[in-house]
């Protein structure tokens, strides 16, 4: 799984803003709706999915769009943890993870996962040595 996050402080390219404005003002239908606006929005969404899949050389059904970082983090972490739980139920995170990461890991604890939180230095960096100590075989 590849997860993209355009940080909340990243200035988007002008072309991205222009595209967003066009889609937001002309193709604002719910892509799950049966009406014409919805059908048009669904076509546009499917076109975007195909473009991303082609770029990444993956299947279209492997591309998921989420409403934001929290939903994306939740999907990526739970999806990966549950898909690979037969390989182990131990997750290593840093002490400065986003709340959505920490909360998702707390939920996974209720499903029997162990969560290890590694510290960061004064610059907010994670030490490779700390990660290596936290990893279980």
Residue spans for each PLM region:
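Pyridoxal 5′-phosphate
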Residues: 1-137
């Amino acid at each position: 799984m590849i997860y993209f996050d355009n940080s909340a402080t990243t200035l988007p390219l002008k072309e991205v803003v222009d595209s967003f404005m066009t889609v937001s003002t002309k193709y604002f239908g719910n892509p799950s709706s049966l009406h014409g606006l919805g059908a048009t929005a669904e076509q546009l969404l499917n076109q975007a999915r195909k473009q991303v899949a082609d770029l990444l050389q993956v299947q279209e059904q492997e591309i998921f769009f989420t409403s934001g970082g929290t939903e994306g983090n939740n999907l990526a972490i739970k999806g990966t943890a549950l898909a690979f739980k037969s390989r182990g139920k131990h997750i290593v995170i840093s002490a400065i993870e986003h709340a959505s990461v920490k909360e998702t890991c707390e939920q996974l604890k209720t499903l029997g996962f162990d969560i290890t939180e590694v510290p960061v230095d004064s610059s907010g960096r994670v030490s490779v040595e700390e990660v290596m100590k936290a990893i279980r075989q």
